[in-house]
Amino acid sequence: MAGERRKGMKFSKLYSFKCFKPFSREDHSQIGSRGYSRVVFCNDPDNPEALQLNYRGNYVSTTKYTAANFIPKSLFEQFRRVANIYFLVVAFVSFSPLAPYTAPSVLAPLLIVIGATMVKEGVEDLRRRKQDVEANNRKVEVLGKTGTFVETKWKNLRVGDLVKVHKDEYFPADLLLLSSSYEDGICYVETMNLDGETNLKLKHALEITSDEESIKNFRGMIKCEDPNEHLYSFVGTLYFEGKQYPLSPQQILLRDSKLKNTDYVYGVVVFTGHDTKVMQNATDPPSKRSKIEKKMDQIIYILFSILIVIAFTGSVFFGIATRRDMSDNGKLRRWYLRPDHTTVFYDPRRAVAAAFFHFLTALMLYGYLIPISLYVSIEVVKVLQSIFINQDQEMYHEETDRPARARTSNLNEELGQVDTILSDKTGTLTCNSMEFVKCSIAGTAYGRGMTEVEVALRKQKGLMTQEEVGDNESLSIKEQKAVKGFNFWDERIVDGQWINQPNAELIQKFFRVLAICHTAIPDVNSDTGEITYEAESPDEAAFVIASRELGFEFFSRSQTSISLHEIDHMTGEKVDRVYELLHVLEFSSSRKRMSVIVRNPENRLLLLSKGADSVMFKRLAKHGRQNERETKEHIKKYAEAGLRTLVITYREIDEDEYIVWEEEFLNAKTLVTEDRDALIDAAADKIEKDLILLGSTAVEDKLQKGVPDCIEKLSQAGVKIWVLTGDKTETAINIGYACSLLREGMKQILVTLDSSDIEALEKQGDKEAVAKASFQSIKKQLREGMSQTAAVTDNSAKENSEMFGLVIDGKSLTYALDSKLEKEFLELAIRCNSVICCRSSPKQKALVTRLVKNGTGRTTLAIGDGANDVGMLQEADIGVGISGAEGMQAVMASDFAIAQFRFLERLLLVHGHWCYRRITLMICYFFYKNLAFGFTLFWYEAYASFSGKPAYNDWYMSCYNVFFTSLPVIALGVFDQDVSARLCLKYPLLYQEGVQNVLFSWERILGWMLNGVISSMIIFFLTINTMATQAFRKDGQVVDYSVLGVTMYSSVVWTVNCQMAISINYFTWIQHCFIWGSIGVWYLFLVIYGSLPPTFSTTAFQVFVETSAPSPIYWLVLFLVVFSALLPYFTYRAFQIKFRPMYHDIIVEQRRTERTETAPNAVLGELPVQVEFTLHHLRANLSRRDSWN
């Protein structure tokens, strides 16, 4: 079986290239120094020297708490919040005589809130502990002292142990691969748990350790880097039989990755437990807090200030009243209080001290102004909101079986306030599914038909004729029959016709480069014989497929060769040719090119290279520039058609030159220093010169479904969209037109360094002069752009004002991001309707995002799909990852994940708007209900000469926030909708309510606070004045303290819950149950609590059953007070809807009118003034925000 497998998998010797073979000529200067001090004794963990090193064991714990520290550590986490600290202090003081109520009544709500959070933390930690136990107790085979493999638990592994891992098992630690079931020591690894990628990685063992028979007797020593978090790097040396062998990431198998398609592997443990790279990466992502949450903290501080002010005011009046209780001649004013025989708390002779102690009492008494359950309620609401986002079927992508995912619940409401979206292009706006559509060879363009971008652009400009539509449709039918990745048609070269072309030899060389210059893996289906390719990028896959379809089939590769089925251009027959693979000069974002060095069957050394035009044309030899002008013209046309282009070149290398270069290159590869990569790039740079131009490729990356409509809708919502792409300027501009980012009639402001003066300075090689001239050029262009937009900005409120689109390339962006120019660049950018940054590096993407976020102070959202977008996602206020073809790094670094860009429309305009509105209304209501309750205590205190006696029973106050008013507000935060999802999408301008923070402005917050204070005044004074002098009992007695307290408290509970009912726009049965159920729970509590013995129920004893409930006055006063307390809000809302309606009010009124009248626009006849005022106000604000200072 193993032999058959080896035979069938010969092709998989991919990474056993000669360039990866170990060499003993290594500089070990850094081994043993700081950062490179780890020593591993292979297969000898009991070595005395190994024992002295005392490395960590393989036991892993990801829990936050232990049984010993759970209570203190969890309590510490809870009391980091200022409000909780306040309530804790109050709880302690409640045991003193200063307390206006009993200690248990204070402790109960605090314990409930803290306890609920601690239970949540404990449950989550128990889940983590369960996962840890499962992982630590997994079994793995380890080589024992007897020379046989025995099973042991993961947690018992030690550094230096030799282990055997079987197919589909996870690696228990970071291992050095010694051998595998394959002859050449390779294995396939799935790294889903590390980076989210599902495609298999290929690893290979050093040739010296790949012999399975001698593996049990293997002894060696590894000196390598210390534990670190870098998943894709490893520096070390293996000392074996007197020789030194450099180690690379290709030999390292990381913990929690899985062995696939390989029967077994042998490995030696290098890093264990928390030293493994996966555990080194187990850190929390950057903490992000929404602007609403930050503002909420400010409101809490305001409430604390109000608390201190009213407590101080009460203590001053109390001190004055206490001082007056005894006049200078010793006469007592309030003799019935016996001020001559009292404690310091009421002693007229020590009035200042009495006032101070009263101040402390008042701080506790009015503490209900601070909402103790606010934070917990918001956490619950946000989690439930996240569940709704995750379950939204409209954001589920059936083709990939990927739903939307809220990876954090902290930023739900922030989704409703996004001002600027910064988007990657490839894989985000486009499908990242490359198709070979055109090419230029020897100055001749090949490939028929129009691209998707060309069609969209011509349709937008109204230039598309019926004949062109028919031609393109016929080509589309051919494309549907083509294989994936190849939508090319040109009768001159398909089906082997290229051999009849006058430049057939150059065509042969062109496609030969495409078939050889790559790192793809051929996979042959044993049943059908069909070959598929595993490539590092969709571009590479498209090139290999294109070369195969045009007669150059890549079918096998080993560590030293690449084999092709080729069409011979002389005979037209297929022949097999084997090319010896010597070195691969890998692609990187800085190099922007890739090359391979091969020896062809004629024994000639060839360098085959492909790369970006910005770097390749500079490397052409003088005699290799034939057809350069034509090729550049074709590249420009391809870019205008939205295609991605690469330049294809080659050169023949002299044998002597190669020998000298190879020695330098190999020396660079075997270095163990920080500048190793730079030295490798420098060596590669020396051979990649004097190239001969063959032509260029053009691949199409089609737009994702629904992207233009999504961008159009977001633009209507007033959201600005920036595209940050690595593409050429022409490509980016035309993609911008195709996806509606740029529109016909929009004036483009192009900022670039393509000027003859700067090019002349570059040729002279004067870098300082180039930098200075470039800086001045960008400064001038930015100021010219500012002058163009100035007139429009001054008249921004006018309809149909001119629109601008800013396009800036990567070189220009480098200078625009300079601290001296960034302010001008940003001000110009935010005056434009669309911004495209071309040729952007990953670092520039992150810097632009930071500039927009910090410079505007508004909410930014970054969206991308690749590892190069991670910095941008983490820098933005909100990071959205696209789960696309470039792995899952972006998703794992994001706050929200969606499968397609078009789902961003619903995520923002629907869920963002709802969450923003729910959270803001929820917070405002929280402060309203606490002020309405807390100020009734203050008014009663003032009425009772600030005696320090609360108006209510202790347990009434304790249960207010926890039981009688908490559930309705949670229901509000989860279920309320001002308008339906359909209307959110139909009227995108509604989204501006969140962007402009209309619903959480200081005006609105203070308005709700004022509403609470007014309600408290009405409740208190109306209750006092209607009940204090009236006969309440049948025997003529007036109300006492306990009845008055129950009546006021009932009025508060009814008022705040009815206020909730009239504030809600979208009722569900859950909200009905919670609102009216909370009122019912209050009466149920009153009956049960009042039936307890008087020693416990105190003033509540039978007060409702025997006194309040039987009295008609109680119910009459309750109705009158509640109605009167709600009347100011009713009045305000009626005025607002009539004269200053909010945009959602207009929509709701319009929909209501449409349902009751046949005329669909009847509301516009009834509310013209309101509509025009509101729309004008929104547009004015929308334009005004574009002027940044």
Curated annotation (Swiss-Prot):
<feature type="transmembrane region" description="Helical">
    <location>
        <begin position="1070"/>
        <end position="1090"/>
    </location>
</feature>
<dbReference type="GO" id="GO:0140326">
    <property type="term" value="F:ATPase-coupled intramembrane lipid transporter activity"/>
</dbReference>
<feature type="topological domain" description="Cytoplasmic">
    <location>
        <begin position="121"/>
        <end position="299"/>
    </location>
</feature>
<dbReference type="InterPro" id="IPR023214">
    <property type="entry name" value="HAD_sf"/>
</dbReference>
<feature type="topological domain" description="Extracellular">
    <location>
        <begin position="322"/>
        <end position="358"/>
    </location>
</feature>
<dbReference type="Pfam" id="PF13246">
    <property type="entry name" value="Cation_ATPase"/>
</dbReference>
<feature type="topological domain" description="Cytoplasmic">
    <location>
        <begin position="1133"/>
        <end position="1189"/>
    </location>
</feature>
<feature type="transmembrane region" description="Helical">
    <location>
        <begin position="98"/>
        <end position="120"/>
    </location>
</feature>
<dbReference type="GO" id="GO:0015914">
    <property type="term" value="P:phospholipid transport"/>
</dbReference>
<dbReference type="GO" id="GO:0016887">
    <property type="term" value="F:ATP hydrolysis activity"/>
</dbReference>
<dbReference type="GO" id="GO:0016020">
    <property type="term" value="C:membrane"/>
</dbReference>
<comment type="similarity">
    <text>Belongs to the cation transport ATPase (P-type) (TC 3.A.3) family. Type IV subfamily.</text>
</comment>
<dbReference type="InterPro" id="IPR018303">
    <property type="entry name" value="ATPase_P-typ_P_site"/>
</dbReference>
<feature type="topological domain" description="Extracellular">
    <location>
        <begin position="941"/>
        <end position="954"/>
    </location>
</feature>
<comment type="function">
    <text>Involved in transport of phospholipids.</text>
</comment>
<dbReference type="Pfam" id="PF16212">
    <property type="entry name" value="PhoLip_ATPase_C"/>
</dbReference>
<feature type="topological domain" description="Extracellular">
    <location>
        <begin position="1028"/>
        <end position="1040"/>
    </location>
</feature>
<dbReference type="InterPro" id="IPR008250">
    <property type="entry name" value="ATPase_P-typ_transduc_dom_A_sf"/>
</dbReference>
<dbReference type="InterPro" id="IPR032631">
    <property type="entry name" value="P-type_ATPase_N"/>
</dbReference>
<feature type="transmembrane region" description="Helical">
    <location>
        <begin position="359"/>
        <end position="376"/>
    </location>
</feature>
<feature type="transmembrane region" description="Helical">
    <location>
        <begin position="72"/>
        <end position="93"/>
    </location>
</feature>
<dbReference type="InterPro" id="IPR023299">
    <property type="entry name" value="ATPase_P-typ_cyto_dom_N"/>
</dbReference>
<dbReference type="Pfam" id="PF16209">
    <property type="entry name" value="PhoLip_ATPase_N"/>
</dbReference>
<feature type="transmembrane region" description="Helical">
    <location>
        <begin position="955"/>
        <end position="974"/>
    </location>
</feature>
<keyword id="KW-0812">Transmembrane</keyword>
<keyword id="KW-1278">Translocase</keyword>
<dbReference type="GO" id="GO:0005524">
    <property type="term" value="F:ATP binding"/>
</dbReference>
<feature type="transmembrane region" description="Helical">
    <location>
        <begin position="1041"/>
        <end position="1063"/>
    </location>
</feature>
<feature type="topological domain" description="Extracellular">
    <location>
        <begin position="94"/>
        <end position="97"/>
    </location>
</feature>
<dbReference type="InterPro" id="IPR001757">
    <property type="entry name" value="P_typ_ATPase"/>
</dbReference>
<feature type="topological domain" description="Cytoplasmic">
    <location>
        <begin position="377"/>
        <end position="920"/>
    </location>
</feature>
<feature type="binding site">
    <location>
        <position position="869"/>
    </location>
    <ligand>
        <name>Mg(2+)</name>
    </ligand>
</feature>
<feature type="transmembrane region" description="Helical">
    <location>
        <begin position="921"/>
        <end position="940"/>
    </location>
</feature>
<feature type="topological domain" description="Cytoplasmic">
    <location>
        <begin position="1"/>
        <end position="71"/>
    </location>
</feature>
<keyword id="KW-0472">Membrane</keyword>
<keyword id="KW-1133">Transmembrane helix</keyword>
<protein>
    <recommendedName>
        <fullName>Probable phospholipid-transporting ATPase 8</fullName>
        <ecNumber>7.6.2.1</ecNumber>
    </recommendedName>
</protein>
<dbReference type="InterPro" id="IPR032630">
    <property type="entry name" value="P_typ_ATPase_c"/>
</dbReference>
<keyword id="KW-0479">Metal-binding</keyword>
<feature type="active site" description="4-aspartylphosphate intermediate">
    <location>
        <position position="424"/>
    </location>
</feature>
<feature type="binding site">
    <location>
        <position position="865"/>
    </location>
    <ligand>
        <name>Mg(2+)</name>
    </ligand>
</feature>
<dbReference type="GO" id="GO:0000287">
    <property type="term" value="F:magnesium ion binding"/>
</dbReference>
